[in-house]
Amino acid sequence: MVDEVVNSRPVGIFGDYDVDGATSAAMISSYLEQCGCKTFIHIPDRFLEGYGPNEKALKALHEKGSELIITVDCGISSFEPLQAMNSVNIDLIVIDHHIPDVRLPPAYAIINPKRVDNHKGYEDLCAAGVTFIFLIGLNRELRKKGFFKNKKEPDLFQFLDLVALGTVCDVVPLIKLNRAFVKQGLSIMKKRENFGIKALSDISKLSSAPNTQALGFSLGPRINAGGRIGNSELGVYLLKETDENKAFEIASKLDDLNKKRRFLTTELESKIVGQIEKIISE
């Protein structure tokens, strides 16, 4: 990973289509781009591709120029797609928090606090938390190499708002390190420096800075809406957007999709209730 950054090689990122996946992918992409690396992101279509890495998408990331692909919030059970990439000498790093099998998939590195050989704890972290710790380690190694001698070192604390968002929306226990992440992340959100979160907060008409309830019930559902009935990549591009006007445009699209999702959900519930009542009456 250090070699990829030092040599400014493009990196592929494959993320999950929920908030945890979007925040994780946005963090890695933003960090690498601040270090001078180009990134290519793929978030799968929930209905056409399903959950987790697939060979076609991984090959597409490789064809764009990525010799290294990172999967976030997925990949721990994707044996066949990862094996296919190994056969053509593509390095893969799996960053996940889901429970693995005893046998691990073929990858250059697997970062998962639920590995049976992990004795450092952190089993309650979501992918965003694991990703943040990964970036801390990567940043430390780059510093040792003197990579930041003539360039600005990324401020890792800027990503804690994304860590907090992913942590709350993935409904992991808010204890220990998770609690610290969320507390610090909410403080950073008050500064409104992430244009994506700022735009979502404004569109959600929050009367004050986001709290855990706002993350879980206002911001999170809007980000998830893209993966459920629209473009699954909207969420991650919103969270890494550096242009305030573009961020507002993306947030508006997600808000519209969320309204559509709520309408469809209500309509479906009404149909189901009607069918049940009909069966009972008969």
Where are these regions (language model features)?
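Hydrophobic helix-and-loop "lid/oligomerization" segment in the mid-to-C-terminal part
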Residues: 1-68, 87-89, 106, 140-282
